[in-house]
């Protein structure tokens, strides 16, 4: 996922839907300024940094801990329950949670870097498999290419695979 994915997943867990009409609030300076989403995501990231875990796991665990009413609809809570890694690749400044007072750039960087390392391990086992890029035509394809390079440079055979971009 990219950073927007965790924002939307958090909103779904909290209230059962995403919550903002961008067009209605962009001109007023309110875009991305919802207090609750920023506080929840940034607290989850800070805790994840303290625990040395990835951003996806950190948010999933935090949502479960808070027992939000729609956690059953959350990709991240489901991933934690099933012990399936969901990696989150953030570009600082691109997500609404980065403009909140609780945003901690060091924690964001630490947790998203943990996820990059996890993603590299996953890509190193991609031989004969498929990579589906969903929702990011710019950032995530670049992350994939870097992870593929890391895997190959570490001696993993990753030549026979299929990719598809859904954006």
Enumerate the predicted regions with their spans.
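Conserved active-site and cofactor/substrate-binding residues in soluble primary-metabolism enzymes
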Residues: 36, 50, 54, 70, ...
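Hydrophobic/aromatic ligand-binding patch that stacks against planar heteroaromatic rings
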Residues: 78, 122, 150
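Buried hydrophobic positions in well-ordered alpha/beta secondary-structure cores of metabolic enzymes
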Residues: 1-3, 75, 86, 147
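Glycine-rich anion-binding loop/nest that anchors nucleotide
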Residues: 1, 87-93, 115, 120-143, ...
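Ligand-binding beta-strand-loop-alpha-helix segment within the catalytic cores
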Residues: 8, 21-83, 87-88
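Short acidic, glycine/serine/threonine-rich loops at helix termini
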Residues: 9-15, 98-102, 143-146
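Active-site rim beta-loop-alpha module in soluble metabolic enzymes
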Residues: 83, 87-101, 105
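A glycine- and small-aliphatic-rich helix-loop capping segment at beta-alpha/alpha-beta transitions
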Residues: 14-24, 104-106
């Amino acid at each position: 996922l990219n950073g927007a994915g965790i924002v939307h997943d958090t909103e779904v867990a909290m209230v059962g839907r995403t919550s903002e009409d961008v067009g209605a609030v962009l001109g007023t300076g309110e875009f991305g300024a919802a207090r609750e989403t920023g506080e929840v995501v940034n607290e989850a990231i800070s805790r994840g940094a303290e625990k040395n875990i990835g951003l996806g796991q950190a948010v999933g665990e935090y949502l479960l801990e808070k027992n939000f009413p729609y956690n059953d609809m959350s990709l991240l809570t489901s991933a934690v329950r099933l012990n399936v890694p969901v990696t989150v690749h953030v570009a600082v400044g691109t997500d609404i949670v980065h403009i909140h007072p609780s945003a901690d750039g060091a924690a964001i960087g630490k947790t998203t870097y943990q996820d990059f390392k996890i993603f590299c391990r996953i890509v190193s086992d991609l031989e004969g498999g498929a990579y589906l890029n969903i929702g990011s035509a710019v950032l995530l394809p670049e992350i994939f290419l870097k992870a593929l390079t890391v895997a190959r440079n570490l001696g993993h055979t990753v030549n026979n695979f299929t990719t598809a971009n859904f954006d």
